[in-house]
Swiss-Prot record:
Region described as Alpha C-terminal domain (alpha-CTD): 246-338
Gene3D superfamilies noted in UniProt: 5' to 3' exonuclease, C-terminal subdomain, DNA-directed RNA polymerase, insert domain, RNA polymerase, RBP11-like subunit
NCBIfam families: PRK05182.2-3, PRK05182.2-5, rpoA
Disulfide cysteine pairs (residue numbers): none
Keywords: DNA-directed RNA polymerase, Nucleotidyltransferase, Transcription, Transferase
Subunit structure: Homodimer. The RNAP catalytic core consists of 2 alpha, 1 beta, 1 beta' and 1 omega subunit. When a sigma factor is associated with the core the holoenzyme is formed, which can initiate transcription.
Purpose: DNA-dependent RNA polymerase catalyzes the transcription of DNA into RNA using the four ribonucleoside triphosphates as substrates.
Organism classification: Bacteria, Pseudomonadati, Campylobacterota, Epsilonproteobacteria, Campylobacterales
Similarity annotation: Belongs to the RNA polymerase alpha chain family.
Name of the protein: DNA-directed RNA polymerase subunit alpha
Amino acid sequence: MRKITTSAYMPTEIEVENVSENVAKIIAYPFETGYAVTLAHPLRRLLYTSTVGYAPTAVKIDGVSHEFDSMRGMLEDVAIFIINLKGIRFKIKGDSKREVIEYNFTGPKEITGKDLNNDIVEIVNPDAYLATINEDADLKFSVVIEKGIGYVPSESIRDYVSSDYIALDAFFTPVIRAIYDIENVFVEDNPDYEKIIFTITTDGQVSAVDAFKNALEAMYQQMSVFKGIVDIDTGKSFTKQIPSGEHSKLFESIENLNLSARSFNCLEKADIKFVGEIVIMDESELKGIKNLGKKSLEEIKSVMEEIGYPIGNEEIKDKKEVLSKKIAELKKKAKDDK
């Protein structure tokens, strides 16, 4: 029998099983009815869209002008060669996000992924087939390898690659397959709780467990915007909610500074409504506020020091453009809502 509660049951168990080198099962339970699919579905989507991987984004082949061309001495035409190339999974060994790799093969030879290994890249599927060339062929080509997420069409890549390169559709995700099953599980003789069983397969660029961790982090980052919601009251009959983030104090009304009436009124008349607007000003700009005397200036400087944002704060100055834009948006929204 299900008991009446005022909060959802918190899952307490997680199991990780490495089925093979690139396959893992991740099991978590127990969840309230309906919670399992609510969490599992977006995680599955994020596994595909947010896991960082590597892919060939452009190729230049000596003697070839376009993807529908053919090459003497190569069994495959260029279109098939490109399809095979996109099926080879590269991994840059260093920290670089982009590398241009040059290859030169003389026939007769059957070229596979292992032949593309070098000091710069590792091929995680070395048995993948690329092309076959005969004794008359001399195959020279350059491949651009980039680091990214998700899928980027060739039209977007064509905008920035050299005209002598053929732009490729780039499939960055290293996650080959991500599925989940939901099963019922008992909690105190109640079978209505749920278990999530993820089965994740990658191409070897990253482990399945690391891919899952990455998806969790991506979900947390995306959802965190809703975590920091605060009220803003400017004293002008509007209250808005905005994400607070790392520097929530910056988006509070200047009323919260508890300044003297004279100091507050000077700022108010200068259309300064948020703490962040003061932070991004230097002392000379503050002095330029109409009717703001020396005593008020010292009061404002003292209060800003107390809340941890001294005038001329270098950390915030580096974010001035972003902060100014966000505050401008808040002001506009407040004005529109009047």
